[in-house]
UniProtKB/Swiss-Prot annotation:
Residues 231-256 have a biased composition (Acidic residues). GO terms for cellular component: extracellular region. This is Coiled-coil domain-containing protein 1. It comes from Lottia gigantea. Residues 53-73, 109-129, 208-242, 287-308 form a coiled coil. Residues 231-260, 288-378 are annotated as: Disordered.
Amino acid sequence: MAARSALCFLAIITLFVYACGRPALNFNSIYKDSRSSVKHFPRVTDSRYAYTKIDSKLDSILSELQKEQNDRDDDDDDDDEDDLFDEINDIFDDVMDDDIEEDGDDIHEVEKIEEAVDDVIDMIDDIIDDDADDDSDDVPEDLNDAQEDILELIKDSNDDKNDDETSDIIDDILDIVEDAKDADDHRPIADIRVVESLSKPGAVAEDDKESKKIDETVQELLDEIKDVVEDANDDVNDILDTDDEDEDEDVQEEKDEDIHEDVGNVMVNLMHGVHGVTGGGVNHDIYEEIEEKMDEVDDFIDDAIDEHNDDDVNDDENDDVYDEHDDLVDDVNDDADDDNDDADDDNDDADDDNDDSDDNDDSDDDNDDDDIDDVADDVLEVIVDAVEAMNTPTNV
């Protein structure tokens, strides 16, 4: 149970960061390519066969889960599960506690992402409930318990000062997974099947050589996640730290297109990933549905960029949209303000001197962050819709 939770936890990080790791979406430029990309996927003449193959693999995994659960003592099972998540949480806590206090103003961003991740966890819960026993409800609950720390890792990995810490945390997580897999009495649920389904479809590895290949694949996935987050951070800072008024219109337009293209490429990779997980058994109707959703997100991004480039954004008097955003930030930060009262008192004099300029700067920064957060929410909706469609049998 504990190991299965750890692997599900890795799956969520993989899907989530791929979709949210980049701030904006341009599907105009890639749709000329995206449609041709879809053509590369093998056409399935009988979708029922494809979904039967997927269901069969899922049944096999869940059968292993059922058998292993029946062989374990309930108390031992709970203890092992608690120990695993305690160890993961301790790793995150050591690095993140100070940052959470210092970056209280960013908590509202984490909560928005948290709501989106809740949707993914609910989806996993629904799938498990269809085929597993009541004990499987513990899986999404445990993931939810560790969720806050996971999100803090993703957020803080955007900061250059945390690059080394992020790398260390990823190594620690890998060690935990490796230790769980090597344990004689509690091997991961369905062993390496879940990891393999995320990385490369094929037969279950039954010797050390194949196991080593899968371990290397997991490491590559984690390294790729880290690279995506770091690249996204650089791209966003390059755009948002530039004064639009001092920039030639053609240059700004090129930057806007770059934002679209970067995240657009992530979505194309996601489509390839869905194809890989199912071994090529995805009906093309799903791609059409993804494409429609991507068009909607593309329109949303265009509006957000237009709003970002609007001269009125930097005026002293914000419009209703930004007033509403400021109200939201104020509400979310109330608790953080209470925790930091002592520090605020010490800095009152300096804050008073800088109130006018700081308020305007923070407002502009929050407005930019809000556009990016909304984009991340829409992207995750695309993922959820796509995965739900993938798990819904299609009649031919």
